[in-house]
Amino acid sequence: MPIKVPNDLPAATVLEEENLFVMRQDRADTQDIRPLEIIVLNLMPTKVETEIQIMRLLSNTPLQINVTLLQMSTHVSKNISQEYLDKFYATFDEVKDRKWDGLIITGAPVENIDFSEVDYWDELCEIMDWSVKNVFSTMHICWGAQAGLYHHYGVDKYPLEEKMSGVFPHRALVGDDPLLRGCDDVFWFPHSRHTEVRARDILKNPHLHIIAVSDEAGVGIVISEKANQVFITGHMEYDAKTLSYEYYRDLGRGMNPHVPYHYFPDDDPSRDPLMTWRSTANLIFGNWLNYYIYQNTPFDLNDVGKE
């Protein structure tokens, strides 16, 4: 089944060229079906690339999904025009009076500064508070996961001596969580971050459960007690060459980055990387949509947040 997007969203054309089922707004309006209503709060500077990456994963399920892109009103983007954002993105004021099945909060390249110094931090906190009663399940990605764990549970982030960049093996700590259903005993996905959350801090909170870890990358996936919040510390949504782009970008900035771990064949940046996490990403996003949302969300969205 498709995701529904605005008629002229550029990401839709890219996804259609990949033979993914994208339903334009005008066709979707004729469907008599209860689709899932998902918000994507896109905090990444690479807006269009992130749209494509997230929507590619959302579209690969049997469920029909309406996607609403959300921008921060208190932040001025340096990498895309406000005209584009106004055309394709909603503001919080435009979505806050509705209930939603799911919310995805992406990462952002701001982990080296304190949360309170992020210019849109207050607005993000308002959105995260609102999500507790108005969204059935929220997925937080990378810095979004760190922000959510800090805001909701007081879990701090810590600076790393070296950027955590690469594709790392993870293992499940639980055998029966639906989010990991179908995953291999060892499953890989990328990390790209300068800070980390630590297991010892998370384990102090009885309302949080670590369900996947990596010996190299640390905490991988955390869920809340009721599984209405998911925190993924890496970037499953990344394309095959995203880490390569970031590596060469940092080289160009004179930052002397380490070659991403377990990524380029023979650690040779001149060779094209293999994408070893595609199935993991599709499984976990699909499981989140199916088991965490579709199987449990109320048919009447107005009932979201009611005990």
From Swiss-Prot:
Substrate binds at residues 163, 192, 249. It catalyses: L-homoserine + acetyl-CoA = O-acetyl-L-homoserine + CoA. The record marks 192 as: Important for substrate specificity. Keywords: Acyltransferase, Amino-acid biosynthesis, Cytoplasm, Methionine biosynthesis, Transferase. Transmembrane segments: none annotated. Pathway: Amino-acid biosynthesis; L-methionine biosynthesis via de novo pathway; O-acetyl-L-homoserine from L-homoserine: step 1/1. Its main location: cytoplasm. The active site is at 142 (acyl-thioester intermediate), 235 (proton acceptor), 237. It comes from the Archaea. Its EC number is 2.3.1.31. Pfam families: HTS. It is found in: Cytoplasm. One of its GO terms (cellular component) is cytoplasm. PANTHER family: HOMOSERINE O-SUCCINYLTRANSFERASE. This is Homoserine O-acetyltransferase.
